[in-house]
Amino acid sequence: MQSHLSAWLVKHELVHRSLGFDYQGIETLQIKPEDWDSIAVISYVYGYNYLRSQCAYDVAPGGFLASVYHLTRIQYGVDQPEEVCIKVFVPRENPIVPSVFWVWRSADFQERESYDMFGISYDNHPRLKRILMPESWIGWPLRKDYITPNFYEIQDAH
């Protein structure tokens, strides 16, 4: 069994890997970072015009980082949305993923948060900078190998 998007990608010989279905029947697809920008545009044109969420996670200490996208396509009415989950895995030493800001504007703050917490750089993002942590913060706080500083002084906290 495949989602409509997965079947379309297979038909057009676009490389991806199915990671299975979740409990709601939503398929998760693994896409290579170098293919993500073109597959994002194809997904949008195919009808996945709503980016429900973008997030990131650390797969394992010293392992890969993942950028995750939940896309929705409403073709047969709002009570029957078709959803797909896209995962892009990148090495932690040089975590670069093409930004999808230019496809889904709602990716703006979400990609910035993933950058701020995990250090994933979103190539061609127009304003990629910290959004939650101070600009002076060192490190990526949600990585599993992050060492919490013993003390951090907040300047001008008034």
From Swiss-Prot:
Reactions performed catalytically: a plastoquinone + NADH + (n+1) H(+)(in) = a plastoquinol + NAD(+) + n H(+)(out); a plastoquinone + NADPH + (n+1) H(+)(in) = a plastoquinol + NADP(+) + n H(+)(out)
Q: One GO molecular function term?
A: quinone binding
Task: Name a GO CC annotation attached to this entry.
Answer: chloroplast thylakoid membrane
State which Enzyme Commission number(s) the record gives.
7.1.1.-
Annotated PROSITE patterns: COMPLEX1_30K
Q: What's the main place this protein lives?
A: plastid
Q: Which family does it belong to?
A: Belongs to the complex I 30 kDa subunit family.
Q: What is this protein called?
A: NAD(P)H-quinone oxidoreductase subunit J, chloroplastic
Species name for this entry?
A: Lemna minor
Q: Upper taxonomic classification of the species?
A: Eukaryota, Viridiplantae, Streptophyta, Embryophyta, Tracheophyta
Query: Gene of origin?
Result: ndhJ
